[in-house]
């Protein structure tokens, strides 16, 4: 995986609190165990008027022409609550979302997002309010997220955010759990060479 340093992208504002993982990716789409192909089912029950996903809901914000191609999702508090399904960040990433900005995220969803190389940015409610106002008032509004400096820039204003150093290291260097393990491949091989043959 390539690391995340900085990203500038179009923002889609999802002005709803407590969005759970069942809304992000409904349970009927959880049959697969790889990460590809879930984007078309993202927010299925909100994006579409039919079960087959062929009739877009014109009232849902992500279907608006001005937000097509958005890579930054702006949301309200407690985003990603509910069950711990990793399919939720898979669907967001497959749709093209690289950054999520909200006042808070559910803990498991927050960790799963980082494992899937998406950056969940926590700002204060008032800061999120300001960005909502900027995005809704300006078609094509973009924000820049700088993970190295831990800054969000929107409407020529900067907002600082915090992320623990270990998770920041993983994102900057494109490391998931497997990548972290492979960093110690030489030590693992050295240990395995010392294991008595009858234990192998």
Swiss-Prot record:
Q: What class of enzyme is it?
A: lyase
Q: Does the keyword Lyase apply?
A: yes
Q: Which Gene3D superfamilies does this entry report, sorted A to Z?
A: Aconitase, domain 4
Pathway of action: Amino-acid biosynthesis; L-leucine biosynthesis; L-leucine from 3-methyl-2-oxobutanoate: step 2/4
One Pfam family from the UniProt entry?
Aconitase_C
Q: Which reaction does it catalyse?
A: (2R,3S)-3-isopropylmalate = (2S)-2-isopropylmalate
**One record GO biological process:** L-leucine biosynthetic process
Q: Which HAMAP family match?
A: LeuD_type1 (MF_01031)
What is known about what this protein does?
A: Catalyzes the isomerization between 2-isopropylmalate and 3-isopropylmalate, via the formation of 2-isopropylmaleate.
Name listed for the protein in its UniProt record: 3-isopropylmalate dehydratase small subunit
| Native organism | Aliivibrio fischeri (strain ATCC 700601 / ES114)
Lineage at the top is: Bacteria, Pseudomonadati, Pseudomonadota, Gammaproteobacteria, Vibrionales
């Amino acid at each position: 995986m390539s690391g995340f340093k900085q990203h500038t992208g179009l923002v889609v504002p999802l002005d709803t609190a407590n969005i759970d993982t069942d809304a992000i990716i409904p349970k009927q789409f959880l049959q697969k165990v790889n990460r590809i192909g879930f984007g078309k089912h993202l927010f299925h029950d909100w994006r579409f008027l039919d079960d087959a996903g062929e009739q877009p809901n014109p009232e849902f914000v992500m279907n608006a022409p001005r937000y097509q191609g958005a890579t930054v999702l702006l949301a309200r508090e407690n985003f990603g609550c509910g069950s711990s399904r990793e399919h939720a960040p898979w669907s967001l990433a497959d749709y093209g979302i690289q950054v999520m900005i909200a006042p808070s995220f559910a803990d498991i969803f927050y960790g799963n997002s980082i494992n899937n190389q998406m950056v969940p940015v926590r700002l204060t409610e008032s800061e999120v309010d300001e960005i909502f106002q900027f995005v809704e008032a300006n078609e094509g509004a973009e924000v820049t997220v700088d993970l190295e400096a831990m800054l969000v820039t929107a409407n020529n204003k900067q907002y600082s955010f915090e992320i623990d150093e270990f998770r920041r290291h993983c994102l900057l260097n494109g490391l998931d759990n497997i990548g972290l393990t492979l960093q110690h491949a030489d030590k693992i091989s050295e240990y395995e060479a010392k294991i008595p043959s009858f234990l192998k």
